[in-house]
Amino acid sequence: MSQLDTTTPSGDYLMALDAGTGSVRAVIFDLNGNQIAAGQAEWLHLPVPDVPGSMEFDLTTNWQLTCQCIRQALHLAKLPASAIRAVAACSMREGIVLYDRSGTPIWACANVDARASREVSELKELHNNGFELEVYQCSGQTLALSAMPRLLWLAHYRPDIYRQAGTLTMISDWLANMLSGELAVDPSNAGTTGMLDLVTRNWQPNLLEMAGLRADILSPVKETGTLLGHVTAKAAQECGLLAGTPVVMGGGDVQLGCLGLGVVHAGQTAVLGGTFWQQVVNLPQPIIDPNMNTRINPHVIPGMVQAESISFFTGLTMRWFRDAFCAEEKLLAQRLGIDTYSLLEDMAARVPAGAYGVMPIFSDVMRFKSWYHAAPSFINLSLDPEKCNKATLFRALEENAAIVSACNLAQIAEFSGVKASSVVFAGGGAKGKLWSQILADVTGVPVKVPVVKEATALGCAIAAGVGVGLYEALDKTGERLVRWEREYIPNTEHKALYQAAKTNWQAVYTDQLGLVDCGLTTSLWKAPCL
């Protein structure tokens, strides 16, 4: 839990509920976008015995944790519940919740649930192996992470739940439902089910019918920033908010994060550096990738979509390197009172650009249709300790993350015609000054780093404010509230060097994938059914 700023000229505040993969937060903002206080709690997803890949979302415990966070945030902010003018919720995408016909939640799974591999394969075979292409052309999604295979799994193995189901929503919508009693989804999050039309921003029931699934479980669609309902007396008693507080439609975490970063116009580009890295490009109208390498999601801005590529485990790889190899640096950083990553960046800054040719093999470029990665490794190491050491490997990892991002952005530009003129870099990775400069050098465009690097909750609060008329519009408010810390200008000499390094890495990575294909090494990650 944290308390950041308790000074505001206004008596009006907004609350965002942010349901991530590993934790939930309740965050209070003033109307100038300053974070006042936050309550946070970790949560775990539940594997079902004898169901490989299952990760169920604990509805009872997680609502209790959410209520705990709301009360913590109010306490830390020293605010009465009456000061909260509106609340909205955002969440990890792909996670779904089912309700019975009376509106009671009965089953949910997290975004990481991978139980439905067999069902993915079964659905891919429909229409002479053309069903996945039909899904992608309509929704911008493939089957690997979509809701239909999970629903089919329930029909096969939990027909009791499947028969009871009356409505489906996303996890952000479940939070809004627990507060207000109302059921609806927004396009940005529901779009990741693979059942929503990118053009109409509404459900496409015929996709479920083609899959042999029920199409009568689709809830109403309401745009982000639309008033959904009000906090019920029951919810108020449980969570500490005032009964009657407006509850506004939120959305998907990445899209609301882009709103909080002011990435709201066609052509704008962001790299969000967390556990996964997302490369996001706003497109002027729905366009799909003919090679199915890139997912296309509805933005929270009506009429706009986002091309999104994902680099796998980028932040996790850095944490692994720090914890596995940098015990001395962790102790030194502790004594100096600085972050270990800052110390490692200082060391890596003394290594020449190109990291002496060391090539990390971790995440591949995104290939949404056939999504898997090579086995983790370092290639082209030297036995010269002056050239090949922890500083070199750390710099190589930062350079590689930037190279994969640049490759993903190039893929998007190839099919969409939208090429980044600058990049907004946010998330934990953007705290690294060297990393930000490397990203500018590799992409060849200026990189802007915001003051608020974790902007998802801010975007969610903006939606809450728009829903009750405190802000004029989502896009204008996102632009107005974002503040910039620094801009990094690309080094043209480094750009040429990194272009050659990118070409070499792509060739080596292709060979490494071949080792996985032969069963000689183990993939970093594979999509269900591959």
UniProtKB/Swiss-Prot annotation:
It comes from the Bacteria. It is found in: Cytoplasm. Its EC number is 2.7.1.189. GO terms for biological process: carbohydrate metabolic process; quorum sensing. GO terms for cellular component: cytoplasm. Keywords: Cytoplasm, Kinase, Transferase. Coiled coil: none annotated. Pfam families: FGGY_C, FGGY_N. NCBIfam families: PRK10939.1 (NF008187). Catalyzes the phosphorylation of autoinducer-2 (AI-2) to phospho-AI-2, which subsequently inactivates the transcriptional regulator LsrR and leads to the transcription of the lsr operon. Phosphorylates the ring-open form of (S)-4,5-dihydroxypentane-2,3-dione (DPD), which is the precursor to all AI-2 signaling molecules, at the C5 position. Belongs to the FGGY kinase family. This is Autoinducer-2 kinase. It comes from Yersinia pestis. The lineage of its organism: Bacteria, Pseudomonadati, Pseudomonadota, Gammaproteobacteria, Enterobacterales.
